[in-house]
Amino acid sequence: LHADILKTRIFKGSYQIFPQKYLAITNGITHRRWLALANQGLYHLVREYVKGDILKDYRLFEQILPYKDDKEFCKKYEKVKRNNKIRFAKYIKEKQGIEVNPESIFDVHCKRLHEYKRQLLKCLHIIYIYQKIKKDPAYITTPITFIFAAKAAPGYARAKEIIRLIHSIQEMVNKDPDMDGKIQVVFVENYCVSVAEILIPAADISEQISTAGMEASGTGNMKFMMNGALTIGTMDGANIEIAERVGQENIFIFGDSAEGNYNKKMYHTYNPGIIFENHPG
C-alpha cells in the first residue's frame, strides 16, 4: 500500500526516473523478545505443543493451529492470559496507585501519540460509552478497562493536549460511582519497552485504528497479535498483511480505505457534520 503511495503520489516524478531505487520492505519484530522474553507463560505453553525450536524457526508456530478448538489448550491459554493481566494490575498499582480489575477486558491503545494514530477517536468512543451507561446502567455487562500508553514529541502541542484530554477522561470516569464495575480508564505513565513487555501480554483487545493511508507499517499490531490480543483496526500498514494471513474472520476491520480517504481529501467531500446528524446516538 505505502510503496504504491510513494510511487504514484509523493515521489511520482522521482519514481518515473529511478524506479530501481524503490523497494518495499515491511517492518518486523522478534518473537524472541516479544514472546519468549515478554510472555514466558505463553512461550512455555507453545513449546508443549510444538516440535522443534521455535526460537530458531518462527514458522513452527503453525503447529498450534490444530489445537485452536482444543479445550485443554484453551484452558491453559486462558490461565496464561489471566496471569499476565494480574501482573500488569500489580505493576500499575505499585507505580501509579490505580486499582485495575484483572477480570475486565483490557482494551489497549498503545503507541506513539499522533493525530493520525487516532487516540482522539478512542477518547470519543469512551465518552460515548460513558454517556450510554449514564442513561442505561445495563448498557455494559462485561467490565472494560481502557488502557492508553503513549508519549508525545516535545514540540507536538496538540498531541500533548490529547494526553491532557485522556487524563481528564480518566478522572471523570474513575471517580464516577456509576462506572464502578463497568468501565475504567488508565493512562500508563513513562511508557517504554520494559513497560510494553508487561502491558502487551496482558491485552485482550489491540487498537490499531490509524487513518488508512497514514501508517507505513507499524509493529505494535504484530506484538499484540503474537500475544493473543484481538485486533480492531483499519486497512492500513501491516494490518493489511495481518488480515491476509489470519483471515478476515480473525481480525475486526472498520473504516474507509486509503484510497477513499485520499479522495475525500482531494475532492473535499468529507463532512463529519452529516455523519453526526445521521447518527444522533
Summary of predicted features, one role per range:
Residues L1-I5, K12-T30:
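Donor nucleotide-sugar binding/catalytic pocket of nucleotide-sugar-dependent glycosyltransferases
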Residues L23, Y139-I140, G155-A159, I163, ...:
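Substrate-recognition/cap regions that form aromatic- and gly/pro-loop-enriched pockets
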Residues R82-A196:
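Long, K/E/R/D-enriched contiguous segments that form extended
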Residues F148-A149, F187-N190, Q208-T211, G233-M235:
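Short His-Asn-centered micro-motif
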Residues F18, T26-I64, P201-A202, I209-G281:
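Catalytic binding pocket for nucleotide-activated donors in carbohydrate/polymer assembly enzymes
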Residues A38-E99:
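Extended, charge-enriched "interface" segments that sit outside catalytic cores
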Residues H2-L6, T30-W34, E115-Y116, K122-C123, ...:
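Flexible loop/turn segments at secondary-structure boundaries
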Residues L1-K12, P272-G281:
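Extended catalytic-interface subdomain
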